[in-house]
UniProtKB/Swiss-Prot annotation:
Localization terms from the record: Virion membrane
Membrane topology: Single-pass type I membrane protein
Transmembrane helix in keyword set: yes
Origin species: Human cytomegalovirus (strain Merlin)
Lineage top rank: taxon: Viruses
Protein name: Membrane protein RL13
Alphabetical list of SUPFAM superfamilies matching this protein: Immunoglobulin
Keywords, comma-separated and alphabetical: Membrane, Signal, Transmembrane, Transmembrane helix, Viral envelope protein, Virion
Signal peptide interval: 1-19
Chain's role: May play a role in modifying tropism or in modulating cell signaling during virus entry. Since RL13 expression severely impairs HCMV replication in epithelial cell cultures, it may act as a regulator promoting persistence by suppressing the switch to fully lytic infection.
A GO cellular component entry from the record: viral envelope
Length: 293
């Protein structure tokens, strides 16, 4: 019986000692810090779940907005390609002209003797030049007939050709059979866009008995409002051409100018004093006396 009482009192004492002791004798039974960490991890896992759902919604909306942009880009490309290619169809030939910085067009024009014809074009251009190509025997020859800019207008009279030009057209009046041929216009914009157009003019007799009043050729001479140096040089050249001075007189004047220049150079050299070619040594040379001693 005594040993039963001893065991009972021992258990009671151990129980009271455990109640007053706040330490954890065994790490496997201690749950104070573990409980706190578990609650924290549960809170974190709950916060992660809504975040993942929000990201998936943003991804879905971005994909939906990207699809229309791709369709719009495809429309722009197709529109640019269709506006870039210009097709010209003739009776026996089809050619495609692409609007690059240099484009060439060809037109067939028919005119009647004694009447007039207009070779016109559209668009805003900065520099216009008209050329006339010769007869079939002169395929590679061209003659400038007109140059027009915003502040400059000049025509080159060509035989019996009656014409006038401006920034949008070339007017040929009082047509004759000799006016048949090719007329080429070269035009340039401010952005260096270059374009050529060839007009093949065929002049024939009209099927009419009416009398056509011939117009007098009122060709415009040089009308220049620009005062730059290169335009002044053009005036000088045109004046010399109109003077029609023989070549012998030009040679005589050139010889006189060269002779005067040579005489001026010779007289200028004679006025300058000549420098001596050597320097005289003194009679007494100290170096020579030193060597003798």
């Amino acid at each position: 019986m005594h040993w039963h009482l001893a065991i009972t009192w021992t258990v009671i004492i151990l129980t009271f000692s455990e109640c007053y002791n706040q330490t954890c004798p065994c790490p496997c039974i201690c749950v104070n810090s573990t409980t706190v960490s578990i609650s924290t991890s549960e809170t974190t896992s709950k916060n992660i779940t809504p975040t993942t759902t929000t990201n998936s919604k943003k991804t879905t909306s971005s994909i939906a907005t990207t699809t229309p942009s791709l369709v719009t880009t495809g429309k722009v490309v197709s529109t640019a390609a269709s506006s870039t290619i210009i097709s010209q169809t003739n009776r026996s030939h089809t050619s495609n002209a692409i609007t690059t910085p240099k484009t060439r067009f060809e037109y067939n024009i028919t005119g009647y003797v004694g009447q007039e014809v207009t070779l016109n074009f559209t668009g805003s251009w900065n520099y216009i030049q008209w050329f006339r190509y010769g007869s079939p025997g002169w395929l590679y020859s061209s003659e400038p007939i007109c140059t027009v800019t915003s502040n400059y207008h000049h025509t080159f009279p060509r035989g019996a050709l009656c014409f006038d030009c401006d920034m949008t057209k070339l007017l040929i009046y009082d047509l004759t059979l000799n006016d048949s041929g090719k007329y080429v216009v070269k035009r340039t914009r401010h952005d260096n866009q270059y374009e050529e157009a060839c007009y093949s003019l065929t002049v024939i007799f009209a099927n009419t008995t009416s009398i056509v009043t011939n117009r007098t050729c009122d060709r415009k001479r040089t009308e220049n409002t620009d005062t730059t140096n290169h335009e002044i040089g053009k005036h000088i050249i045109e004046t010399i051409k109109k003077a029609n001075i023989p070549l012998g007189i030009h040679a005589v004047w050139a010889g006189i100018v060269v002779s005067v220049a040579l005489i001026a150079l010779y007289m200028g050299n004679r006025r300058r004093p000549r420098k001596p070619r050597y320097t005289r040594l003194p009679k007494y040379d100290p170096d020579e006396s030193w060597t003798k001693t």
